[in-house]
C-alpha cells in the first residue's frame, strides 16, 4: 500500500502479532472475466458501528484494490500454500498454537512444550459473539478452528496463482490473516468472500471487512465488483 496510508495494515499487524517479511509480490494476473454467478443472492450486510475501525481509511485502501473477475480455480490445492501451520516466524511454535495463544484467554499449556502447545482456553468468538471453551483432543479441538480471513482458495483466484511457493506459505501463516473462531461457523464460511459470506454477529462485520481489505492491500490481491460492493455496504453501517 502507498506510504501515505499505511496505518490500517500497520495497526492490523500490530494487533495480530509479528509476521514474516515478504518480498515484492509478482505482477497480478491479466484482466479476467467476471465470475459466473456474481448475481447470486448477497448476504445481509447489516453492521453495528465499531469505533475501532477507521472507515475512511478502509475505504481509501479498498479504492486502491484492483477490481476484476476472479481467475479460474483450476490448479488450486491447499498443499500449494505449504504445510498446514508451519513455524514461519521461527519462534519454535506452529502457527495454529500461536493464534490460539493470542486469541484465547485463561490458556493452559502442555508441559514440556515451552508454552507452545495450547491445551485449553476460552474463546470469545468474533463470528458468533458466543463464548467457547477450547479443550485439545481428538473429539474436541475442532470446536475452535483457525480461519483464514481471506480464504486460501479466494486468494488463489485473485492473484496468488502467480506467487512464489514461499509467498504462498507466508500468506497461509500470516497472523494478520488468521483468527481463532467457532469451528462450525468457519465450516459454513468455506472459501467465501464478502460477497457471499459475512460473520453472523453484526458487531464483528466492520472489523472483519477491514481485516479483509488490509490483507488484500498488503498482498496485492484484487476484489470482484460484487465483493467491493458488499464491503462498502458493510462500511455504511460502521
Predicted region positions:
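Domain-level detector of nuclease and nuclease-like folds
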Residues: 127-238
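C-terminal region of N-terminal signal peptides and the immediate post-cleavage residues
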Residues: 1-10
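Secreted/periplasmic proteins that engage bacterial cell-wall peptidoglycan
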Residues: 72-145, 149-150
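N-terminal module-boundary/linker segments of secreted carbohydrate-active enzymes
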Residues: 23-93, 227
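Compositionally biased regions
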Residues: 5, 19, 39-40
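Charged, low-complexity interaction regions
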Residues: 17-22, 221-222
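Extracytoplasmic/secreted envelope proteins and their assembly/folding machinery
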Residues: 9, 26-29, 55-62, 73, ...
Amino acid at each position: 500500500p502507498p506510504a501515505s496510508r499505511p496505518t490500517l495494515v500497520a495497526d492490523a499487524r500490530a494487533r495480530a502479532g509479528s509476521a514474516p517479511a515478504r518480498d515484492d509480490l509478482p505482477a497480478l494476473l491479466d484482466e479476467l472475466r467476471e465470475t459466473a454467478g456474481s448475481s447470486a443472492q448477497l448476504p445481509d450486510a447489516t453492521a453495528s458501528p465499531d469505533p475501532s475501525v477507521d472507515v475512511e481509511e478502509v475505504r481509501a485502501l479498498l479504492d486502491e484494490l484492483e477490481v476484476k473477475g476472479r481467475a479460474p480455480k483450476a490448479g488450486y490445492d491447499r498443499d500449494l500454500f505449504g504445510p498446514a501451520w508451519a513455524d514461519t516466524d521461527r519462534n519454535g511454535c506452529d502457527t495454529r498454537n500461536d493464534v490460539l495463544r493470542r486469541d484465547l484467554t485463561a490458556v493452559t499449556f502442555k508441559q514440556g512444550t515451552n508454552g507452545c502447545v495450547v491445551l485449553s482456553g476460552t474463546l470469545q468468538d468474533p463470528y458468533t459473539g458466543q463464548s467457547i471453551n477450547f479443550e485439545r483432543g481428538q473429539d474436541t479441538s475442532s470446536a475452535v478452528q483457525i480461519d483464514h480471513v481471506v480464504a486460501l482458495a479466494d486468494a488463489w483466484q485473485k492473484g496468488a496463482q502467480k506467487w512464489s511457493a514461499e509467498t504462498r506459505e507466508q500468506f497461509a501463516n500470516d497472523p494478520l490473516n488468521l483468527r481463532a473462531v467457532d469451528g462450525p461457523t468457519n465450516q459454513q464460511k468455506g472459501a467465501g468472500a464478502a460477497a457471499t459470506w459475512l460473520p453472523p454477529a453484526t458487531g464483528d462485520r466492520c472489523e472483519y471487512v477491514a481485516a479483509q481489505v488490509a490483507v488484500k492491500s498488503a498482498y496485492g490481491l484484487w476484489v470482484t465488483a460484487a465483493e467491493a460492493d458488499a464491503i462498502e455496504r458493510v462500511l455504511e453501517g460502521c
